[in-house]
Amino acid sequence: MRYLIAYLFVLSACSDGIKTLPSSTGILSEVIFVVEDMLWENQVKDVAFRTFGVPILGLTQDESSFRVIQVNHSEFKSILKTHKNIVIISKNVPTSNQQNKWANGQLVVQLEFKDDDNELIKDLNKVKAIFEFREIKILRNSISKSSQKTQEKLIKEQFNIETLIPSEYTIIKDTVALFWATYNPEKQEEIKHLFVFSFEPKAINLQQEVLQKTDSIFAKYLLGAKHGQHVKIEDMFSPVYSENTYRGLWKLNGGFMGGPFLIKTYFIDKKVVVTVGLIFAPNNRKRKYIKTFEAIL
């Protein structure tokens, strides 16, 4: 009995030492910078906004990649320590990163400050890329829990790509040539479309051909209420291309609707597979929609 009591005491002591971390707070599009006020104002602030605060390409209004929040070390306590995204910048500390440091679902990056703008820009761009990749991964994992698995399997068979179809979308067309799904609730001023199609490239300028093919899909399937109205790529703002991704704006020809779109392309068996996400949400900021398209397409 004496040994049993001693064993239970040791077991209890071990259990008491285990800390259960709280869930992380804040949103994925925010980053808290923990930097002393003088260092922030004189040397870090401008670089932080030139990296994390840069506007998302392909939108009519400025929406930053991340919302930047700064606090000094003495203010960094309580709920701020449980935020999802934290960057700590100090002098004479080793650079490191740690997941779930003070909360589950958290990433904390610590940077050693170097009195060199170019080095700081390089470091913060690397950190930003990590947070962007992490955000897309988290969004994709979250959406995949309730996405339309049967439909995704068919798209995989037809086009040989892995895309996600969120549960709220209604399938309009599903053939070997074209997949089309839409989200258009009656009581919300919000419309989303997803397209997947492929073609054999023939033009010398592939980027132009991708946009022309996409424009023809818009003109054929996305029609307005009046005769002759259809969606088209906005000519006044040239789409931005980078790493198989196109970001641009669409408008309703002969109407007043418009918004952003995102295209991703893949080279599969001598064909170009095109995935498109398009959003109309005049009353909302567009960042969350674009990030979701990045995650699912």
Locate the predicted segments by residue:
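Signature of long, low-cysteine stretches enriched in small and polar/charged residues
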Residues: 19, 69-113, 219-274, 284-287
